[in-house]
């Protein structure tokens, strides 16, 4: 299968508006700046991302993966506006085209369950800080992928097998 990739609207906003500070935190006040109408920017991003996805589908993509690299930096009261709703709109677009969707809301930790239930993607990519047993027990509406910390590859063969078996 050919997987297409897109950045989620929030992640694109972080880069477009320079929201990420050197300390790794988000300057959320910029999203409230009157100079930017953040709601219009979000709406436009979703619109153009859907066009981009349609082009990827027409070029042969079988699956879409949405990377929300900076989702974990969204304050909890803003998750619905900046993470759940934009991803839901894109997921619904993909489903209308009969294309499965994998979402990666990186860094939202215990909010993975809320994301699964609100956005309803076909699959979710796990962060390596998500307990695989918790994920298997709770994220039952989606296919799961990923989750193992990249440093695991530097461990002994036995440790690598033990860690991999947690995900099987």
Positions of PLM-derived features:
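Active-site loop segments of alpha/beta catalytic cores
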Residues: 1-168
């Amino acid at each position: 299968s050919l997987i297409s990739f897109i950045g989620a609207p929030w992640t694109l906003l972080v880069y477009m508006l320079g929201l990420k500070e050197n300390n790794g935190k988000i300057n959320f006040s910029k999203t409230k700046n009157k100079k930017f109408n953040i709601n219009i920017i979000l709406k436009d991003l979703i619109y153009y991302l859907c066009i981009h996805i349609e082009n990827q589908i027409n070029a042969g993509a079988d699956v879409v993966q949405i990377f929300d690299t900076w989702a974990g930096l969204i304050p909890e009261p803003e998750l619905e506006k900046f993470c759940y709703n934009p991803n839901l709109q894109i997921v619904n677009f993909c489903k209308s085209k009969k294309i499965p969707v994998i979402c990666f809301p990186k860094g939202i930790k215990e909010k993975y369950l809320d994301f699964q239930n609100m956005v309803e993607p076909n699959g979710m990519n796990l962060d390596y800080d998500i307990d695989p047993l918790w994920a298997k027990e709770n994220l039952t509406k989606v296919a799961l992928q990923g989750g193992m910390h990249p440093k695991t590859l530097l461990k002994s063969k036995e440790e690598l097998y033990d860690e991999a078996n947690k995900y099987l």
